[in-house]
Amino acid sequence: MSRRGWALFSAMAVIWGIPYLLIRVAVRQLDPGVLVLLRTAPVAVLFMPLVIVQGSVRAMLKDFKWIAIFGIVEFGVPWYLMSTAERHISSSLTSLLICCVPLFAVVFQRIRRTEEHISPRRLLGLGIGAVGVAFLVGLDLRGGSITWIALMLIVCLGYTIGPIILALKLTHVPGIAVVAGATAIVALIWLPWGIVHWPTHISSETWTSVAILSIVCTAGAFLIFFELIKEVGATRSVVVTYFNTAIAVVLGVIGLHESLTAGIIVGFPLVLVGSIFATSSAKSEPTILVA
């Protein structure tokens, strides 16, 4: 990758590594549905003017049905389930489970029998990265609730299917228009729930977490991610998931006092090695979004 590619990649790793901590902080006071509303509404408000300037309103409305389906599968359901799960499991474990997404994507590729050749080198890289993440967190499934882990696997499924919808039905619609329409629809869906479950008081800490989560980690992240896709392609962009996890673990340990395991010392180098191997593929594939 070029220097610009690495810069964008690093920025994405940080920006998409932060949300796990922010969600964990926000759900202490906010209902998960309220958090989804507060995360999507500002993005829609910020992106809609860009859609108008681009002249993409007609394209967005023409494919309203598929944008709605994409939004529900990629944002509406996963973000609610993730926020619910983070009330019961650590941000580190959450980020680890999200790393199943690239592996799910490979499985879906094989099931769909796409023409793209998945090289042994790339499969090895994804495998090494997954093992590294497991060492990073020192995962013990017996120590966590199977219910919340199951919810996170559903999140991973949504994050896998969403990009497939994007690739099959929405490639002709500008990315910003898709995100603007999808977040607007999800915000409207969760609006009644948000009104009913709105808390009587929201602390400044919670507002700060929500603001960063929505404006920086969602709106800002998508703008950077679109540039990253242009620079390095969708295949290499997938690997940002592993770096997200490394950063999420560090933030969980420092900011939330989550357990610091010896596996971090072993796991982080494995994540880096796995990422290098996995980025060696150059052919395109459906973009994987894991914000």
Regions found by a protein language model. Give the residues of each.
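Helix-helix packing/entry segments at the starts of transmembrane helices
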Residues: L37-L38, F75, T94-C100, P163-A187, ...
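Hydrophobic transmembrane alpha-helices of multi-pass small-molecule transport proteins
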Residues: F47, A68, C99-C100, F108, ...
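Glycine-/small-residue-enriched transmembrane alpha-helix faces in small-molecule transporters
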Residues: M1-L37, I72, Y80, T84, ...
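Specific transmembrane alpha-helical segments of multi-pass solute transporters/efflux pumps
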Residues: I15, P19-Y20, M48-I98, V131-F135, ...
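Transmembrane alpha-helices of multi-pass small-molecule transport proteins
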Residues: Q29-V77, C100-Q109, G158-G162, V179-H197, ...
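Juxtamembrane helix-entry segments on the extracytoplasmic side of multipass membrane proteins
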Residues: M1-W6, R28-L37, A59-K65, G138-I161, ...
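Specific alpha-helical transmembrane segments that line the substrate/conduction pathway
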Residues: V34-V45, V73-E74, W79-E116, P120, ...
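Transmembrane alpha-helical segments that form core, pore/gating elements
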Residues: F47, A105-V107, I111, G129, ...
